[in-house]
Amino acid sequence: MAVPTGKLAHLSAISPRDFTMPNRMAAAVLNDIGTEELAHLEMVSTIVHQLTRDLSMEEIEKSGFGPYYIDHTVGVWPQAAGGVPFNACEFQSKGDPITDLFENLAAEQKARSTYDNILRVVRDIPEIADPIKFLRAREIVHFQRFGEALRSIQEELDAKNFYAFNPSFDNPCTASCKTACQKS
């Protein structure tokens, strides 16, 4: 839930990136997906709560949940499966829409892979597997939408070298890379 592939990290990374998108379509995609990620965070948190709320002390001790319980009882606290607490060090907004969208694309694939791993563990528990399947499907849709946003930005740039400059910071131009680099 709180690793770089987690919902809280993804939500925190996507939401501020929409401000540097150079066109309205891309900004809207990031805003829409960021809003949806908030709902997904609630779903994952609800699953965690439902799995832990009625644990007995014996179950807590046998399952290795003791250290978590000592710090948080059965409160939902964002941390990785390995126990690393959430922090904001693993993600950022670069302010370059191409860079940020590629990072979003990668995050969606990492989330899909995480859901694949979860489904291997909980495949026989439909109360968990069904919402995880839904979330996995949404990651695929998000990946496609981020790809559309990336294409919309690249189509507005110099097709010969759209890495010549940062489209959210440098003056937009349709000139060659050499001309873009010589601006005064």
Regions found by a protein language model. Give the residues of each.
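Non-heme di-metal
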Residues: 1-184
